[in-house]
Amino acid sequence: MDKIDFKKKLSTLYSAPKDSFATVDVPVMKFVKVDGKGDPNRDPAYKAAVEWLYSLSYAMKFASKTKSGKDYVVPPLEGLWWADNPDDFAGRRKHLWQWTMMIMVPDFVERSLYEAALAKSRDKLGEPPLSLRLEPLDEGRCLQTLHIGSYDDEGPTLARLHNEIMPAQGVTFAGRHHEIYLSDPRKTPPEKLKTILRQPVRSAG
């Protein structure tokens, strides 16, 4: 069986225009998730969260291939970001940020494979983060665009979305700011990083 690449199979969700915002209807999708708070560049809990997510995701991928013959490319890392005061998020005061890092899990991967992957990863990494879980995310209607460049340079694009695009379309916030990381920051120069910026919305009326 061919290896499934969800960036291609779900191309409307894992691609976006660079200089405009596309409207997408995101179905309910299953993710393995870890919550945290603080500056991701300084907080060791962030690094541990990402390590756990990848360990689990690859363990589930290999188990799926072995047990059911269904192989797939591990989807990209994604993150939900917010702050109690929206100005702290827009102002890049990262020490006040909260986050949920996550990786999508295909529907055909059963919970038993997650539990087995959890046990395997625990042997390697020790006790998991308390917030580690497998659960669905229901975003529905969203606006998204492709940002190319440093994560710290997203501000003007988000300001345009919040202050121009959303009011013009008569919509308001219906969920947390969502980022999909298409590039590996360990191997990609900051100015070439590709990140999908997504915002769940609903009618403002």
Regions found by a protein language model. Name each.
Residues 1-205:
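A solvent-exposed interaction/effector surface
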